């Protein structure tokens, strides 16, 4: 899709939002998009779906856009949703309530365009909305990026002269500042809980602190300057998560937010920051959006689906409701830019040569080792140093040996069968029919050109894995100390098996699967070539895949297994 002018981006916003118009409730405060469940009740699910389009609509209205149909719905919905006497009342929030998450979009809408969403309300409606938002100051929140929702809400309340708690907001920001690591990276929570470093940097912590740097530029100039400096450093690092064709690294949780991957650069442009030249940032955004538009991410009615490269529930979080994917609309903050902003005439530029040159680059502040292959593939080697098993498929999202922008990764159906486990990019141990993989590492060392981790897939088995990048992939050196005789499968990437030109074979000590677009080869020093026919709908990119692997017999005692994994992609 052509994405160059403001009208191009506006048309894309309407492509995402117009299918929702007939689905809003009579009072405008709820939006029913589907019937799958999450950890919060139906009225919260429908409030979430109502709130998230504001991430695009508020900037659109700020930038002079007209969408009177949506404006009418949201003015009505903000009133009925916060009126305790209304049948569409969103409810009184409790501790750790999902409603606090959704308050962020409402707060930003008030901050960005009060003339659209605040000033038209009656005094009674303003009082109801402010009182409902203020509940965030009287409840506990998780110690993660959620604290910044309270900051945004208090900024919004303060901006319209309503009761707020800026002292509470300052305490929240002080807590978040403790999580800062270096190079622009934060951990998503205090260090003692081993929090992850993932997309909750660009589309959450960094995104919100950039917003703060603008909205609080006069009231808190020192912190605003600090946040802008950190965002600049982060923007130079984060660009390495994108490959030249627009794909972003599939890694971590909440990946159903899809187009939100490039939202950080929209925030930078909106805030007047240039961690990279403006044309380069535009190129990242345009290519990433078009990469998504080439995939079946909408249903037949044009509504976004839960999933990644196609509708898929296995990879979903327990908090991914039918309206959740619209969180990615943060990328449309660009629409707040004035019509004469240079962004609208700048040509989308490619990534700088220094970011795409083949080779290995460490990102120690993110606990990753990044590798560019000669054909443009991006590999990210992960130490599996997170332990939040309360998030769905956490092992698959953080524990693979390597994540690749062209092959994606697989989320298991179950571990009762190797095919259902779909353990691509893992060393999978099969014991009594059950599959066991690296859940997290006991210890890891990130070196300049390799990654070492120690892990225990099962009581009585200890594995030390060394990952060494090569020109077209990497070598895995595993030292296995086992008190159990079992079988292990060292697996490569998942290859689409119903694509044109597909073929796969296991010969001797290796295996290969390829089609007209991609190829993955796995070769062991010893062992036996093997093909894993992964369960349908496990891979994030393609619903039907085969995983080439090497099968090793694991005796009692100490064994050393060496496997080379290489990949090609057009």
Feature roles, as predicted:
Residues 337-475, 484:
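Long, charge-rich C-terminal accessory regions
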Residues 175, 349, 493-496:
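Amphipathic alpha-helical scaffolding segments
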Residues 85-90, 129, 244-250, 257-387:
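Carbohydrate-active enzyme catalytic cores, enriched for enzymes
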Residues 4-16, 20, 48, 67, ...:
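Functional cleft and adjacent loop/helix regions within the main domain
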Residues 47, 100, 322, 363, ...:
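Solvent-exposed loop and beta-edge segments used for protein-protein assembly and interaction
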Residues 414-570:
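Extended repeat-based interaction scaffolds and adjacent low-complexity, acidic/S/T/P-biased segments
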Residues 43-49, 54-60, 67, 71-266:
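Aromatic-lined, polymer-binding surfaces characteristic
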Residues 1-48, 72-77:
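Low-complexity, Ser/Thr/Pro/Gly-enriched N-terminal "stalk/linker" regions
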């Amino acid at each position: 899709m052509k994405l160059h002018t403001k009208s191009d981006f506006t048309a894309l916003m309407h492509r995402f939002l117009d299918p929702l118009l007939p689905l809003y409730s009579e009072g405008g405060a709820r939006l029913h998009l589907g019937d799958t469940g999450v950890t919060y009740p139906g009225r919260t699910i429908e409030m979430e779906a109502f709130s998230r389009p504001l991430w695009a609509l508020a900037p659109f209205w700020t930038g002079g856009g007209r969408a009177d149909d949506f404006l009418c719905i949201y003015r009505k919905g903000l009133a009925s949703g916060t009126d305790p006497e209304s049948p569409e009342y969103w409810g009184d929030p409790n501790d750790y309530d999902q409603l606090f998450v959704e308050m962020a979009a409402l707060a930003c809408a008030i901050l960005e365009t009060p003339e659209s969403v605040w000033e038209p309300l009656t005094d009674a409606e303003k009082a109801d909305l402010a009182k409902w938002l203020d509940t965030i100051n009287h409840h506990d929140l998780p110690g993660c990026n959620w604290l910044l929702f309270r900051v945004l809400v208090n900024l919004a309340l303060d901006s319209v002269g309503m009761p707020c708690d800026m002292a509470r907001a300052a305490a929240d920001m002080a807590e978040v500042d403790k999580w800062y690591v270096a190079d622009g990276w934060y951990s998503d929570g205090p260090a003692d809980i081993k929090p992850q470093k993932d997309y909750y940097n660009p589309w959450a912590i960094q995104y919100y602190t950039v917003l703060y740097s603008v909205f609080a530029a006069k009231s808190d100039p020192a912190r605003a300057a600090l946040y802008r400096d950190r965002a600049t450093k982060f923007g130079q690092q984060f660009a390495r998560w994108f490959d030249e064709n627009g794909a972003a690294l599939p890694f971590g949780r909440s990946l159903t937010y899809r187009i939100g991957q490039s939202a950080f650069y929209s925030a930078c442009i909106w805030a007047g920051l240039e961690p990279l030249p403006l044309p380069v940032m535009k190129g990242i955004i345009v290519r990433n959006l078009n990469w998504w538009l080439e995939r079946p991410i909408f249903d037949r009615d044009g509504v976004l689906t839960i999933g990644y490269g196609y509708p898929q529930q296995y990879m979903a979080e327990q908090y991914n409701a039918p309206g959740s994917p619209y969180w990615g609309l943060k990328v449309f903050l660009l629409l707040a830019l004035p019509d004469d902003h240079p962004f609208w005439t700048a040509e989308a530029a490619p990534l700088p040569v220094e970011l795409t040159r083949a080779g290995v680059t460490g990102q120690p502040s993110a606990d990753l080792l990044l590798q560019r292959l000669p054909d443009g593939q991006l590999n990210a080697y992960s130490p599996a140093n997170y332990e939040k098993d309360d998030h769905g498929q956490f092992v698959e999202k953080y524990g693979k040996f390597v994540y690749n922008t062209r092959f994606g990764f697989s989320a298991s159906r179950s571990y009762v069968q190797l095919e259902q486990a779909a353990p691509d990019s893992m060393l999978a141990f099969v014991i009594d029919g059950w599959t066991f993989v690296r859940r997290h590492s006991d210890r890891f060392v990130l070196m300049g050109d390799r990654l070492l981790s120690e892990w225990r897939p099962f009581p009585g088995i200890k594995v030390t894995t060394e990952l060494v990048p090569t020109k077209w992939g990497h070598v895995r050196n595993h030292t296995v100390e086992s008190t159990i005789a079992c079988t292990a499968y060292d697996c490569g990437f998942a290859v689409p098996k119903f694509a044109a030109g597909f073929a796969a074979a296991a010969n001797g000590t290796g295996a290969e699967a390829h089609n007209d677009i991609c190829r993955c080869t796995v070769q062991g020093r010893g062992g036996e070539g093997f093909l894993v026919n992964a369960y349908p709908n496990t891979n994030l990119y393609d619903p039907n895949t085969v995983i080439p692997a090497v099968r090793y017999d694991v005796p009692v005692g100490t064994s050393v297994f060496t496997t080379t994994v290489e990949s090609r992609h057009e």
